[in-house]
Amino acid sequence: KSQIQFHNGVTSKEIQETLIKAAADLISAETPNYQYVGGRLINYALRKEVYGGFEPWHIKKLVEKNTVAGFYDAELITKYTDEEWNKINTFIKHDRDDELTYVAMEQLRGKYLCQNRVSGEIFETPQMCYILIAASLFQDYPIETRLQWVKEYYDAISLHDISLPTPVMAGV
């Protein structure tokens, strides 16, 4: 059993991290579904950190914010029109994050999601990471076909039909 302890003045972030650790401690051969509980708890923590709440932002808002902060290439925002960003936003299936296990979410938030490596602040969620990899890869493809490529590639990587090497995932 997990032993959760709180103290006066504990922050909501500390409570969330305690719950994540408690879920991870409960993962076993007899109770394997706690791997999904832990993954979802990490997802909720990420959403609060990135969006300030549970509801994801429009993709263009996230790209603009992270471009201004210096974490995304400034050229990306100009490669797509507002109409294309709106279409790309419809491709994103944020509920796919609910299928990620504790270990997968820890890998993503520890190694692959865009973050400040000094402060540890994270600037995107897994589905935003996946769609932005696709949008970056196909930004110079012909306008007539590139959104279809973005959608198909996003679906393939976000559904884990294909896996990406670390340099691509880490934004190298």
Language model regions located:
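Extended catalytic cores of very large enzyme megasubunits
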Residues: 1-172
